[in-house]
Structures are given as C-alpha cells and as structure tokens.
Swiss-Prot record:
It catalyses: 3-oxopropanoate + NAD(+) + CoA + H2O = hydrogencarbonate + acetyl-CoA + NADH + H(+); 2-methyl-3-oxopropanoate + NAD(+) + CoA + H2O = propanoyl-CoA + hydrogencarbonate + NADH + H(+). This is Malonate-semialdehyde dehydrogenase. Its EC number is 1.2.1.27. InterPro entries: Ald_DH/histidinol_DH, Ald_DH_C, Ald_DH_CS_CYS, Ald_DH_N, Aldehyde_DH_dom, MeMal-semiAld_DH, MSDH_GmP_bac. It holds the Pfam family Aldedh. The active site is at 286 (nucleophile). Catalyzes the oxidation of malonate semialdehyde (MSA) and methylmalonate semialdehyde (MMSA) into acetyl-CoA and propanoyl-CoA, respectively. Is involved in a myo-inositol catabolic pathway. Bicarbonate, and not CO2, is the end-product of the enzymatic reaction. Gene3D superfamilies: Aldehyde Dehydrogenase, Chain A, domain 1, Aldehyde Dehydrogenase, Chain A, domain 2. Homotetramer. GO terms for biological process: inositol catabolic process; thymine catabolic process; valine catabolic process. The gene is iolA.
Length: 486
C-alpha cells in the first residue's frame, strides 16, 4: 500500500521480514519532488549469507516438487499480480518517477514474464532417442541447478526481477534477489505477493543493499548462477567476478540504440515512434532510441516534424496524466545528463530542442526535458556513450549502407530499428546490422517474454540471454543418459 509515511525497508529471509544486521542506510527520494519516501538498508555480507542458507535449505524440498505443481503455484502468483496491477504501477511511479502510463505498461510486461514461467513444464522437456545402438536408449534430462541470484536495476523495478525469479523458481531453483537500492519498495511488494501465493519459506529471499551485497553474491560458493541487468562497466565486473568464482553468469549491459530512417518510411508514424522510443520512461531504458541516422533525402522534413512534435511534450510528475516525460532517478544523474548536453554543444552539435530549459513548473524534482541534437558525429561523447536520458542525437547519412556502417561502429549492440516500407531495405538491414534485437517499423524491439532478450558486443556478457528457452537453459543443467537393460 502507498502511504505518506517514510518507510524503513527490510530484508526478507527464510519467509520473514527482518532488519538488516548492518547499520548503514540510504535515503530513497521521490524523483518528482526530492522528498524522502523511504530508507533502505545497505546490507552487509552476513545478510547475504543468511539468505543463501535459507535458499539452500529450501532447495532440498522445492527442487523435488513436481514441475506441474510448481507451475500451478506460480499461476496463483500471476493472479495476485493481475489483481494488484494498479497499486504496483503507482509504486513504480512513486519511487522511479516514470509516468503512470509507462509504469502500467511495465507492470503488464512483468506479468507476461510470469505467464511464460507458468509454461515451464513444456520448456523443460528433454529429448529422447530410442535404440541408438542395439538395445540402448539415449535421452537428455533437465534438472534445476540450486541456489541462484538476480541483481536488478532501478529503471524497470518490476519487469526485470520478474524476468528472473519466477522462471528460475519454476525450474526448481531457489532464489536470492538483490534489487536496486534506488527502488526498494516495489521489490518488497513483489515478495509480499509471492508469499501470499503460498510458496514455502526460503524459496525467494530479498536482500537490500549496494555493492557489498553484489560482491557477496558473486563470491558466495553456494550460489550457482547470477543474472544481472545494468550498466556496461558493472555488467563486465559482474561477469568477470562471477565466472572467476565458478558461476554461470548472464549480464545484460548498456546500449546506444540506433534507428535508421529511410525516405520511403511513413513519416507521421516514424516521428511518433522515435519520440516514444527516445523520450518515454525519461529515456532511462536499455532499449531507448538514442541515435537516429536519417537519410539525407528526407532529413530536413523528418527533423522539422520531429522537433515540432517534441516541443509539445509536457514534463513533470508522472502521476499527472498530461505529462509525457517524468524525472530522472536522482539529482546526481540529472547533473551527469546536463554535462552530456553541455558537451554536445561544446563539441559543435546543433541543439534543436533544449531539455535544460523546461517551461513547465517542475518543482524540486530531477527533471530534464526532451533534448534533440543535429549534426552529431562519431567523435562526440553524445554519440559514443550511453546517456540514459531523454537525449536524442541525429546523424545524417547518404543511404542505407552508410546508416548500417555507422550503427555498427558503436561498441554497443543491444537494439536497432529501421523505418521503411521497402522489404528489400528491411532484409538488408536485418542481415547486416550488428544488434541482438532488431525492429522493422517497431519502435522498441524488446521481444515478448517467450523470446530470448540479449544484445551483442558490449551490451551483453554471457552465452544465454534472459527469457524463453534461453532462460530455461540458463537455470537448468542437462544430464545425458545412455541406458541399457539386461
């Protein structure tokens, strides 16, 4: 429930809400107002160890629960999430800042991930081939791997945890969850509803905190696998540290997603698509469009319409339905973003829409309005770096070939989009672009939960992505059985 009281956040270990054994806490502000709404503990190693012990004990019985029974239990959780959609969206807007419309969309995508997890019996099925030799049969069986952990970011406090723990638990594992210390309230509610669904104690454990919790997870010998979503430097650290300690790791990292706009595109829909991709959720998402490579032939017309429509966007508190761009997560991030905008100006890019100059009354929140640069090149920081904000760079290219070449020069390769009505252009783009997720006239090419989610290059560290069959393979181990009977 959302209240006006300042909340003292707790950990959830072995089926109980418990105080952290540490004394250090961090304030959690509402990004739209700057007012403190909670204090979250920065838990020490000892709390992680207790959570792992609880998960390890629960694994002994949970892993033996029949697969269909685990799925039925998850279906009860799914129903509770659906019944509480409105409340969950409001919590997201309160602590993350994104508009209620965006938060509602996130809730739905999270629910879809749990829907996938309820179908685990089908996804866990093995393979068999009888009579591989005289009187000998061969088969492959999938088993859970033990205690696994998830480390999740602030920008999707519901969807990303629900990519992880429902599927892992459906596969028979037990889970230790560490969500962002910037958005601890939604994590609490997810865990509350999980246990309302009747799960045994210790199957899911929540440890709040910062880097100490991350390091404790990565170094704990009883954790078999770690799922991570976050920035590129931290993803690299998580992957290298986790694998060094013998763990499976999937680490989804940063992005600099490009869109190529062709002269044969539907101009109106393309403009609205780019606006939605670049500026919704305040640009704080790894699938946001941050660079548009527009072909010269349509560049001026496209930019004129894009700028005019962008200037109509309202900035402010996400609870107000007229606002399109909410606040950034913290004052420190706002200052970082303003630094990037200033660097773009200093480097010679043309500032067409200046998000530093917000006309709406935005109070004390951490607001930066939609920002558009033209005349950007690959030498500029605003082209190279993940800004994670409503900042869009425009690069003019002569044709599709140059647009693809430009896009592939980025060190990131998460998502890429082409806007076109020409099937051959779409085919050429699909076959030659280096990105893990590709959209053709699709603004945000984040796949549905039954497909894998992962990028390439510096956008992903690991072998198996989240969701779909990739997720099931990550959270299970194979046993190949060759048998003969006398």
């Amino acid at each position: 429930m959302i209240t006006t009281e300042i909340k003292r956040v707790k950990n959830h270990i072995n089926g109980e809400w418990v105080e952290s054994t540490g004394t250090e806490v961090e304030a959690v502000p509402n990004p739209a107002t700057g007012k403190i709404i909670a204090y979250v503990p920065l838990s020490p190693k000892e709390d992680v160890e207790k959570a792992v012990e609880a998960a390890k004990a629960a694994y002994e019985t949970w892993s033996k629960v029949p697969v269909p029974n685990r799925s039925r239990q998850l279906y009860k959780y799914l129903q509770l999430l659906q019944e509480n959609k409105e409340e969950l969206a409001k919590i997201i807007t309160l602590e993350n800042g994104k508009t209620l419309t965006d938060a509602t969309g996130e809730v739905q995508r999270g629910i879809e991930a749990v829907e996938l997890a309820t179908s685990t019996p089908n996804l866990m099925m093995g393979q068999a081939l009888p009579n591989i030799a005289s009187g000998i049969d061969g088969s492959i069986w999938r088993y859970p791997i033990g205690v696994v952990a998830g480390i999740t970011p602030f920008n999707f406090p519901m969807m990303i945890p629900l990519w992880m723990f429902p599927l892992a638990i459906a596969c028979g594992n037990t889970f230790v969850l560490k969500t962002s210390e910037r958005t601890p309230l939604l994590a609490e509610r997810l865990v509350e509803l999980f246990y309302e669904a009747g799960f045994p104690k210790g199957v899911l454990n929540l440890v709040q905190g910062g880097k100490d919790v991350v390091n404790s997870i990565l170094e704990n010998k009883d954790i078999q696998a770690v799922s991570f979503v976050g920035s590129e430097p931290v993803a690299r650290y998580v992957y290298e540290t986790g694998t060094k300690h013998g763990k499976r790791v999937q680490a989804l990292a940063g992005a600099k997603n490009h869109a190529i706009v062709m002269p044969d595109c539907n101009l109106e829909k393309t403009v609205q698509g780019v606006i939605g991709s670049a500026f919704a959720s305040s640009g704080e998402r790894c699938m946001a469009c941050s660079v548009v490579a527009v072909v010269d032939e349509i560049a001026d017309e496209f930019i004129d319409v894009l700028v005019a429509e962008t200037k109509k966007l309202k900035v402010g508190d996400g609870f107000h339905e007229d606002n399109y761009v909410g606040p950034l997560i913290r004052e420190s991030h706002k200052e970082r973003v303003l630094g990037y905008i200033n660097s773009g100006v200093a480097d010679g890019a043309t500032l067409l829409v200046d998000g530093r100059k917000i006309k709406e009354e935005v109070g004390d929140g951490y607001f930066v309005g939609a920002t558009i640069f033209d005349g950007v090149n690959q030498e500029m920081k605003i082209w190279q770096d993940e800004i994670f904000a409503p900042v869009l760079s425009i690069v003019r290219v002569k044709d599709l070939e140059e647009g693809i070449k430009l896009t592939n020069q980025s060190k990131f390769a998460n998502g890429a989009v082409i806007y076109t009505s020409n099937g051959k252009h779409a085919q050429t783009f699909r076959d030659n672009i280096d990105a893990g997720m590709i959209g053709v006239n699709v603004n945000v090419p984040a796949p549905m939960a039954f497909f894998a989610f992962a990028g390439n290059k510096a956008s992903f560290f690991g072998d198996l992505g989240t969701n779909g069959t990739d997720g099931v393979q990550f959270y299970t181990r194979k046993k190949v059985v060759t048998e003969r009977w006398f």
